[in-house]
Amino acid sequence: MELTPREKDKLLLYTAALVAERRKARGLKLNYPEAMAYLSMEIVEGARDGRSVAELMAYGRTLLSRDDVMEGIPEMIPEVQVEATFPDGTKLVTVHNPIP
């Protein structure tokens, strides 16, 4: 199977997000890469589900709390920017202060 670089990136992100999701479900606090992967994939999947950019910007702030991540992680992630594919094309979704 031949994959484009973009497809490889999406698969890597999805794999990292699955690991983060499982660790979060077990009650472990997420580190920086896990938190970024988790937030990014939820946004990409939300776009796939048909949500709008505005909905995803608001939704992105509800995914993780300070209790879900290691100390200092919220300050390391002032915003998350993800390119997501919508029915009308690819758009950049920016979530400010994703871990309030």
From Swiss-Prot:
Pfam families in UniProt: Urease_gamma
Output the InterPro entries linked to this UniProt entry.
Urease_gamma, Urease_gamma/gamma-beta_su, Urease_gamma_sf, Urease_subunit
Its annotated pathway?
Answer: Nitrogen metabolism; urea degradation; CO(2) and NH(3) from urea (urease route): step 1/1
Q: Name one GO molecular function term.
A: urease activity
**Where in the cell is the protein located?**
Cytoplasm
Q: Which domain of life is it from?
A: Bacteria
Q: Which UniProt keywords apply?
A: Cytoplasm, Hydrolase
Q: What class of enzyme is it?
A: hydrolase
Reaction catalysed by this enzyme = urea + 2 H2O + H(+) = hydrogencarbonate + 2 NH4(+)
Annotated EC: 3.5.1.5
Where's it mainly located? cytoplasm
Q: Name one GO cellular component term.
A: cytoplasm
**GO biological process terms on file:** urea catabolic process
The record's NCBIfam families line, in alphabetical order, gives: PRK13241.1, urease_gam
Quaternary structure, from the entry: Heterotrimer of UreA (gamma), UreB (beta) and UreC (alpha) subunits. Three heterotrimers associate to form the active enzyme.
As for family, the record states: Belongs to the urease gamma subunit family.
Q: Would you tell me the protein name for this molecule?
A: Urease subunit gamma
Query: What's the source species for this entry?
Result: Hahella chejuensis (strain KCTC 2396)
